[in-house]
């Protein structure tokens, strides 16, 4: 087989491979993107001071760990001194099926580089769990 014919046959194969790799990467990113979108929506509740509503939207594992009234009180004590949100950007997102102290499942740990009116630099960590209803729900929230 001559070189021109080999290139003519290899070209479409290479092109199809190049098109499939980004599609596979997009498919792998899909759970992480959905989890980040859900975390963003949940954080909007927290930013608006709707702490009870944020508890309502949390994962069952989260609700087992802390009652609604205790969550509202704890979040009020942590978030109020920080002041209003100035900026928030996703710093990292990591998919895992195992977390310390949690049952095996599908999780995405999202870290945000955040700035508040009274705290210039903070790291917010929102752990999302894929729950029985097929939705990503918060199973952990930490501010550092």
Labelled PLM ranges:
Residues 28-29, 40-43, 57-64, 113-115:
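Second-shell loop/turn segments in exported
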Residues 93-144:
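Exposed beta-sheet edge and beta->alpha loop/turn motif
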Residues 6-14:
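N-terminal export leaders
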Residues 12, 20-50:
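Short, low-complexity N-terminal intrinsically disordered segments enriched in polar/charged residues
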Residues 1-5:
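N-terminal secretory signal peptides that target proteins for export/translocation
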Residues 36-38, 52-105:
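Short solvent-exposed beta->alpha transition segments
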């Amino acid at each position: 087989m001559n070189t021109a014919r080999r290139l003519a046959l290899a070209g479409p194969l290479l092109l199809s491979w190049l098109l499939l790799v980004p599609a596979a990467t997009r498919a792998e990113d899909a759970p992480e993107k959905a989890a980040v979108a859900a975390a963003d929506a949940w954080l909007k509740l927290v930013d608006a001071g709707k702490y009870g509503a944020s508890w309502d939207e949390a994962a069952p594992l989260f609700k087992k760990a802390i009652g609604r009234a205790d969550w509202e009180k704890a979040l009020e004590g942590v978030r109020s001194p920080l002041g209003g949100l100035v900026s928030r950007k996703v710093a990292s997102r990591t998919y895992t099926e195992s977390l310390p102290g949690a049952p095996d499942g599908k999780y995405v740990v999202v870290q945000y580089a955040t700035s508040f009116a009274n705290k210039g630099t903070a790291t917010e960590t929102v752990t999302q769990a894929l729950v029985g209803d097929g939705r990503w729900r918060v199973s952990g929230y930490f501010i550092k």
